[in-house]
Amino acid sequence: MKFFIFILALQQLYVQSFAQDFDFFYFVLQWPGAYCDSRHSCCYPQTGKPAADFGIHGLWPNYKTGGWPQNCNPDSRFDDLRVSDLMSDLQREWPTLSCPSNDGMKFWTHEWEKHGTCAESELDQHDYFEAGLKLKQKANLLHALTNAGIKPDDKFYEMKDIENTIKQVVGFAPGIECNKDSSHNSQLYQIYLCVDTSASKFINCPVMPHGRCDSRVQFPKF
């Protein structure tokens, strides 16, 4: 029994030796219409076209200084068996539009190995992906924006209205990133919400991400 406890303690120390201290998470949601509009092509997942909703891009540990850790534990590989109960939710809420069409495994592997391994002191692999899913449900941004009259209909909206609507929902100002379509229109692309190290509560952003947006931005259809 003592030997078993000793082994568990060694395993915990091993994880901690790779896990990096961090100050908060960026929880990043991506609008698929803007992703596809800014590229020559985008490919739907093998499960079909995702819903016209914000998809999770990632849950990224960050420092208050503006930097971030990455690839913290090369021995901690993504294992789909550990998230098998979340798979249908991941396919729906955390999809990829990269080409060629795929099942999402490569994307989730990248997110875990680059970002998730740097939060292992707080979240194991299952908890990490489950936290992202819960945060998306908690924010429910498309519902909030639509209720405020801000819809993905190719129309242009005031950035301040988008920011204020999101702030009312999560309680804190978001970071917003825009990109440009083929006509060089500034369009709503990614929304950054700051989250505490337990990945359970939205917080005030210690540092805002850099994202250039015009005062009026397009909310493209998908």
From Swiss-Prot:
Keywords: Disulfide bond, Endonuclease, Hydrolase, Lyase, Nuclease, Signal
Pfam families: Ribonuclease_T2 (PF00445)
GO molecular function: ribonuclease T2 activity; RNA binding
Catalytic activities: a ribonucleotidyl-ribonucleotide-RNA + H2O = a 3'-end 3'-phospho-ribonucleotide-RNA + a 5'-end dephospho-ribonucleoside-RNA + H(+)
Membrane spanning stretches: none
Function per UniProt: May remobilize phosphate, particularly when cells senesce or when phosphate becomes limiting.
Protein name, as recorded: Ribonuclease 3
Organism annotation: Arabidopsis thaliana
